[in-house]
Structures are given as C-alpha cells and as structure tokens.
Regions:
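Ser/Thr/Gly-rich flexible loops in soluble cytosolic domains mediating phosphotransfer, phosphorylation
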Residues: 147-153, 160-204
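Positively charged, amphipathic N-terminal segments that serve as targeting/anchoring signals
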Residues: 1-155, 161-165
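A conserved mid-domain beta-alpha-beta active-site/ligand-binding segment of alpha/beta enzyme cores
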Residues: 181-259
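Conserved small/polar residues in nucleotide/adenosyl-binding loops
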Residues: 264
C-alpha cells in the first residue's frame, strides 16, 4: 500500500518519523500520547551489560533531539519531565544544562523535600508519595515524560488531571506494555490505572521488533526470523516481516496487534 509509512532504517529517520507523528497528532487535538521505539541498537538492547543508566542516558539524548524538532515545527515550548530530582540531576549533568536547546527544558515532576510546605508533604516526599508534591511547568506548552516507572505513573496522571488547558503529554519510551503487566501487584498501582489513564494514551509512534522461531518437521527443523510492529500516526499498525533486505508488511490493523502477530 503506497499510503503505508515505511519503517525507519536509521535512528535519525526514527526520530523524524516520531516528530512527524507527534506534530500531526497535536494538530488533531490529541492530548495524551505514547511514543515507543528502541533507544539503542538491538545488540545493545539485548546486552546484559547495558544498564538502566545507559538506557536512561540514551533516552535523554533522544528526547532532547525529539523535543527540538517539536519546538522547530510548532513553536511550542517543551518541558522534559523526570520522576524526581535525582533523575533530573543526572540528566542535567549528562546534557550540561537544564535548558539544553532553545525552547527545551528539563524538570522534575515531583518537587524536592526542601520544597515541602508542611511536615506531611515532607513525609510523603521522602517516599515519593503525595499528589501535592507534583509540580506543573507553567511556561511549557508540551510535556514529555521520561524514565517513569509503574509506581511513578500516578504522578503523570495527576499532572494530566490538573492541566485545565490540557497541554499535550507525551509518554516517551516508557515501555508501557511491560508496565501495564505490573499493575495490581504488591507495591504497584492498582489495575484501574490502566482504565482511568493509560488506556487514553494514543500510540502515535510505535516500533517494536521481536525474534521468532519456527519449528519444522524436516531439515532445517528450526527457522529463526524477525518481525516488527510499526505505527506512525495517523496510519494503521503494521505487522512487518524482516526479509533480510527490508521489512515486508504482512497485515495492517487500526488497533495494535499482539506481539505474536507473526507466529506461524
């Protein structure tokens, strides 16, 4: 289909497509959005030596470039949000500034203990709890949420609830598929966070690759192959098969298919 977007061949293409999809979604009035793609090359993603810090650092670099494109295309100011002050400080140290690009600024969604106005707020802040400690960024037009865990997602919901002007909120590489599976477990938010909040997040850009194995009754007995699920708003989700030279669309869907869509 000539109307189907081609999956990216490089990280630069991936970022460009994510920016295109986000700008189109914002222009269509979308408020809560999900952008998901591998922040590192496949071999690094699978490497056990790749730490959470490596992933967070890669996502910070990508989010700044992504936000830079949103600013250039829309003129809107973008606030990149981290769950807490320590995460913010690491990002500022890495990027060299809390305003790494014109129109792009880095912030903690949750205020520090020093900013607590009551002993109760200080107590809750110590354990990363209490909606009163969630801080908006008045000068921002768009929010990009980075490195939030499942336990920290209620803070993003609180931000979304407060924003009377309904500024766009983009959940950036948060692996929401995995996080949804943790809801309802001990020490995690209840499952209704999915229905109240996460279910409203529109996947405006989505790229997930997966390895598959096909068993045969005759030689070579086992065939390994790779596929991907890809979506660039406003187009449909595509199930793609890696032919070795390029990805070939196998099926399309208005709703996100399961990761097993390419199992034979």
């Amino acid at each position: 289909d000539d109307d189907l977007a081609d999956p990216p061949q490089t990280m630069a293409q991936c970022l460009q497509q994510a920016q295109d999809a986000t700008v189109a979604a914002i222009e269509d009035g979308q408020i809560l959005m999900d952008v998901e793609f591998p922040p590192l090359a496949a071999d690094l993603m699978d490497d056990p030596n790749t730490s959470a810090g490596d992933m967070a650092g890669a996502n910070t670099r990508l989010a700044i470039k992504y936000a830079q494109g949103i600013v250039a295309r829309t003129g809107k100011k973008v606030a990149i949000l981290y769950p807490d002050v320590p995460e913010l400080e690491r990002a500022v140290e890495q990027s060299g500034s809390n305003t790494p690009q014109p129109g792009v600024s880095l912030h903690s969604l949750r205020a520090s203990i020093a900013e607590a106005e009551t002993p109760q707020q200080a107590f809750f802040a110590l354990f990363g709890k209490g909606k009163e400690m969630v801080r908006e960024v008045p000068e921002a037009d768009v929010y990009v949420g980075l490195t939030f865990s499942a336990q920290e997602l209620p803070d993003v919901e609180e931000l979304d609830t407060r924003e009377s002007s309904k500024k766009p909120i983009i959940l950036f590489n948060l692996k929401l598929d995995t996080q949804r599976g943790d809801l309802g477990l001990p020490a995690f938010p209840p499952k209704d966070l999915q229905w109240r909040f996460l279910s409203r997040a529109k996947a405006v850009y989505f790229l997930r690759t997966r390895q598959y194995t096909l068993s045969l009754p005759e030689p070579p007995f086992v065939v390994n192959y790779q596929g991907a699920i890809f979506r660039q708003y406003p187009g449909p989700f595509q199930c793609l098969l890696d032919t070795g030279k390029a990805f070939r669309p196998v099926s399309t869907s208005a709703r996100r298919p399961a990761l097993g869509c390419l199992l034979y």
